[in-house]
Curated annotation (Swiss-Prot):
Protein name (Swiss-Prot/TrEMBL): Flagellar L-ring protein
InterPro entries named among the record's database cross-references: Flag_Lring
UniProt membrane topology term: Lipid-anchor
GO biological process assignments: bacterial-type flagellum-dependent cell motility
Alphabetical keyword list: Bacterial flagellum, Cell outer membrane, Lipoprotein, Membrane, Palmitate, Signal
Classification via Pfam families: FlgH (PF02107)
PANTHER family the UniProt entry points to: FLAGELLAR L-RING PROTEIN
Predominant subcellular localization, coarse grouping: membrane
Family: Belongs to the FlgH family.
Keyword RNA-binding applies: no
Protein's cellular compartments: Cell outer membrane; Bacterial flagellum basal body
Length: 229
């Protein structure tokens, strides 16, 4: 007896493939870092020496004798003292109340006078609404990270970015920082506080079993997106 193998039709296969792709998309959580620029930069090649053996060296690495070592070129490093403490509180409320009363008599025809001669009508209505809301947040982040100058703006400000990775047991911790630094705010110890950095972006994230345990399952996220409540 010849066996006949039944295969699903092309539309059925397409629907199944689409469903699998949708579930796979639900299984993935967007984890794009907020800092998209490069985390480091290489300094350009120094200029060739025009007078070998002279005291003055026009190369990139040359620094004047009495000049400090603060960063000012691409590839220089700077220490960021992260000291962020942000507190926010918000509260709101609304209360409305409206009432109304109406009394009136209804004139009736002569042949209905015996039934509705003294008919009076009244109406009353009330509308009341009360709502309150509140939110609060407190964030504290302290630490240090050394970053690299990735660009020098025409006004002399430094675009910096850097990354620090720490592997602790089964988790990989990431600290990323980027921003624009005014060279005048850099201290003699070659450091600056994060509160003095413009356009600062600070990111602290992790990868590992602990982070996965804190993440909602893909099937639960799928039904959460479909639930109407």
């Amino acid at each position: 007896m010849k066996q006949v193998r039944l295969l699903p039709s092309a539309p059925v296969r397409a629907v199944c493939a689409l469903a699998v792709a949708a579930l796979a998309g639900c299984a993935q959580i967007p984890r794009d870092p907020i800092i998209q620029q490069p985390m480091t930069a290489q300094p350009p090649m120094p200029m060739s020496m025009q007078a070998p053996g002279s005291i003055y060296n026009p190369g990139y690495a040359g620094r004047p004798l009495f000049e400090d070592q603060r960063p000012r070129n691409v590839g220089d490093i700077l220490t960021i003292m992260i000291a962020e403490n942000i507190n926010a509180t918000k509260s709101s409320g609304a209360n409305t109340n409206r009432q109304g009363n109406t009394d009136f008599s209804v004139p009736t025809a002569g042949f209905l006078g015996g039934l509705f001669a003294k008919a009076n009508m009244s109406a009353a209505g009330a509308n009341k609404f009360a709502a309150t809301g509140g939110a609060s947040a407190a964030n504290t982040f302290n630490g240090t990270i050394t970053v690299t100058v990735t660009n020098v703006l025409p006004n002399g400000n430094l675009v910096v970015s850097g990354e620090k990775q720490m592997l602790i047991n089964q988790g990989n911790e990431f600290v990323r920082f980027s921003g624009v630094v005014n060279p005048n705010t850099i201290s003699g110890a070659n450091s600056v506080y994060s509160t003095q950095v413009a356009d600062a972006k600070i990111e602290y994230s992790s990868k590992g079993y602990i982070n996965e345990a804190e993440t909602m399952g893909w099937l639960q996220r799928f039904f959460l997106n479909l639930a109407p409540w």
